[in-house]
């Protein structure tokens, strides 16, 4: 294949720092001696921007760096695969490289040697590399590529420091492994958010230490992240460590960056679990930070203070008491030795012997059922003062004196009269109730409940105080029930058979009622008993569509009742379990609404496409009709043309006959 003046050739040049690059050019003179490779020939680049402006003479190049343009037919049927040598159209030159990976959209990653680089090209910008031997074109063999963890073209993550305080991880691609001063390093190319390295989006390469490079974490499927989860969030162009602080609809989250404390609202796809690369293995990072209890995630129960029946309770001492255990034996040890000494010392000053006071022990009540006997631990009294205890002793004596009279009265009272009396009390129509009782019984739902379900059996909480006649007698032979009131109402004897009471028996102490007037204490206690079981029924009958405000109101009411000695652990526990379920259901419902809106939008789009499709079908039908008409006209025209051609041939024949007759006539002898 000869080259001559004004023909198109390819010039090998390294002026721009690129090796193995070929430029299109036009020869300005014909080689006089093809065998002399060192002779320089003048040429001009076909790309005008490469020609140096202001130069008086055109550039020259040795003849051995000139070759013909490869013919296009040599590229037919060439299939690019990993390891194929190719020429890439890059910055007005054909640069030689190796295909290392096939990408989507019919594009390829090409590795270049000098300078080291990896660039993504579409197929139309690539051609198979051919070597010119001087007489023919030869295609090199396919190279065998290495497949190590950090081989060229492998996606990795490189650590970078933000504002000198935060380490983030950027997705990059290994270009080449090098060694500097005996240390292994990598030349990497930072990728864009689409993980591509296109020519128009390419970023400069950088050299990093091997300790700053790690593989990309494997994909971990996470259905939904929870509060306080440690995650990595993709922000800007890097993965940064953070903590989930809020969960929103449509799988969006509020994340606080660990280093800067900035808050971001991101999508689920921009999060991933926090992982650590160590010793060539991925390890789980801290999954969750400790959760501080709050009203939204836990319903706190207020601790009860243990107290002996005859010792004063100061605020300082009250803070030392822990929550009463459900194990009665543990409650006996609630008071420390120091507090016991202090209490007995004060009793001696009051004239009471130390031996005559015994520690408060919890009472055990045995209740028989179908399965056997079960022990129900009782709570200790809440911080009763000496004066309160001494005031109750006369009341208890009075209650004994009046017990015979109450028994005679109960015989004449029917069960319906008792219910009417209690119903009137809860509605506040006939009896005066303390502020505490009113605040608890002021629920409209309580008034509407059947009284048969609202009058459970009441068992008062008792504290045993043993007073010996002298130091030699055995203490604690009899127990006294310390209550703020004497049980005079028939209610206390008539409601123990109620099924609702049997489901969760209660033994409240009602000690806060000592502060109320004596004539309303018992009515307040009855109201609180009715209210508790009404609230218990409400908790049991909770519906999915109940609002969170209703649950909060139930929790607050139960917490108030707990101050009076009610055991509210089970209902509060149930409410605490229902709250997150309602939140999740609300989120799902919101997601459902969003999906319905999207479906509606998609339906509108589909309808529009259907209309467009129908329009196109009408156009196609019309075009077919027009094509049929045109075909018929064409056939008619062809027919006419055929007839005319036949007529023309006839006329031509007649003309020839006339000419022959004319010649014959002219040439006839005289």
Curated annotation (Swiss-Prot):
Organism of derivation: Arabidopsis thaliana (Mouse-ear cress)
Protein name in the entry: DUF724 domain-containing protein 1
Biased composition (Polar residues): 294-309, 379-392, 426-442
Keyword list, A-Z: Growth regulation, Nucleus, Transport
InterPro entries (UniProt xref): Agenet-like_dom (IPR008395), Agenet_dom_plant (IPR014002), DUF724 (IPR007930)
Job of this protein: May be involved in the polar growth of plant cells via transportation of RNAs.
Tissue: Expressed in stems and flowers.
Keyword Nucleus: yes
Domain annotation DUF724: ranges: 484-669
Coiled-coil regions, chain positions: none
Tagged with keyword Nucleus: yes
UniProt GO cellular component terms: nucleus
SMART domains referenced in this protein's UniProt entry, alphabetically: Agenet
Domain of life from the UniProt record: Eukaryota
Major localisation: nucleus
Location within or outside the cell: Nucleus
Region (Disordered): 283-315, 368-445
Cysteine pairings via disulfide bonds: none
Disruption phenotype: No visible phenotype under normal growth conditions.
């Amino acid at each position: 294949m000869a080259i001559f003046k004004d023909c198109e050739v390819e010039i090998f040049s390294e002026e721009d720092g690129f090796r193995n690059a070929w430029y299109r050019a036009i020869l300005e003179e014909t080689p006089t001696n093809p065998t002399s490779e060192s002779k320089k020939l003048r040429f001009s680049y076909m790309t005008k921007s490469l020609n140096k402006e202001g130069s008086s003479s055109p550039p020259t190049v040795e003849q051995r760096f000139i070759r013909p343009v490869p013919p296009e037919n040599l590229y037919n049927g060439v299939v690019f695969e990993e390891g194929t040598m190719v020429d890439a159209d890059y910055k007005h030159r054909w640069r030689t490289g190796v295909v290392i990976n096939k990408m989507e959209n019919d594009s390829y990653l090409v590795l270049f040697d000098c300078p080291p680089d990896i660039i993504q090209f579409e197929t139309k910008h690539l051609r198979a590399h051919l070597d010119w031997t001087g007489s023919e074109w030869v295609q090199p063999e396919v190279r065998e590529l290495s497949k190590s963890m950090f081989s060229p073209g492998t996606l990795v993550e490189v650590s970078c420091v933000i504002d000198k305080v935060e380490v983030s991880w950027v997705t990059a691609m290994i270009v080449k492994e090098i060694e500097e001063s005996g240390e292994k390093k990598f030349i990497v190319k930072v990728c864009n958010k689409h993980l591509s390295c296109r020519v128009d989006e390419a970023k400069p390469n950088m050299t990093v230490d091997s300790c700053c490079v790690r593989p990309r974490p494997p994909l971990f499927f996470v259905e939904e992240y929870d509060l306080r989860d440690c995650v990595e969030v993709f922000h800007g162009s890097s993965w940064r460590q953070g903590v989930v602080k809020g969960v929103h609809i449509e799988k969006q989250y509020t994340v606080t960056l660990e280093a800067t404390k900035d808050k971001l609202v991101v999508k689920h796809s921009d999060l991933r679990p926090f992982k650590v690369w160590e010793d060539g293995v991925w390890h789980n990072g801290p999954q969750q930070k400790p959760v501080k209890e709050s009203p939204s995630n836990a319903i706190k129960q207020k601790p009860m203070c243990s107290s002996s029946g005859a010792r004063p309770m100061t605020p300082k001492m009250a803070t030392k008491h822990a929550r009463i255990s459900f194990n009665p034996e543990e409650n006996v040890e609630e008071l420390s030795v120091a507090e016991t000494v202090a209490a007995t010392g004060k009793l001696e000053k009051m004239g009471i012997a130390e031996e005559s006071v015994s520690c408060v022990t919890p009472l055990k009540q045995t209740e028989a059922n179908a399965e056997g006997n079960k022990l129900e631990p009782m709570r200790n009294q809440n911080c009763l003062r000496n004066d309160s205890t001494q005031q109750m002793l006369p009341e208890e004596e009075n209650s004994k004196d009046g017990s015979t009279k109450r028994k005679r009265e109960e015989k004449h009272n029917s069960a319906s009269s008792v219910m009417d009396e209690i119903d009137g009390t809860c509605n506040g129509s006939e009896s005066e109730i303390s502020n505490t009782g009113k605040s608890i019984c002021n629920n409209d739902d309580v008034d509407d409940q059947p009284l048969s379900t609202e009058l459970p059996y009441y068992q008062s909480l008792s504290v045993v105080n043993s007073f010996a006649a002298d130091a030699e007698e055995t203490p604690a032979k009899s127990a006294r029930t310390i209550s703020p009131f004497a049980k005079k109402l028939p209610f206390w004897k008539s409601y123990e058979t109620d099924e609702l009471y049997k489901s969760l028996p209660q033994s409240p102490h009602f000690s806060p009622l000592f502060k109320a007037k004596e004539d309303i204490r018992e009515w307040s206690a009855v109201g609180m008993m009715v209210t508790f079981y009404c609230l218990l029924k409400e908790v049991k009958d909770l519906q999915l569509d109940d609002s969170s405000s209703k649950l909060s109101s139930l929790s607050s009411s139960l917490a108030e009742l707990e101050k009076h000695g009610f055991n509210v652990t089970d209902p509060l526990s149930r409410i605490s379990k229902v709250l997150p379920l309602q939140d999740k259901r609300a989120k799902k419902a919101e997601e459902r609404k969003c999906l319905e809106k999207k479906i509606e939008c998609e339906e509108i789009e589909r309808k529009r496409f259907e209309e467009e499709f129908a329009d196109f079908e009408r156009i196609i039908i019309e075009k077919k009709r027009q094509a049929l008409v045109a075909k018929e006209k064409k056939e008619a025209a062809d027919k006419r043309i055929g007839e005319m051609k036949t007529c023309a041939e006839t006329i031509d024949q007649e003309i020839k006959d006339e000419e022959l007759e004319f010649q014959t006539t002219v040439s006839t002898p005289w």
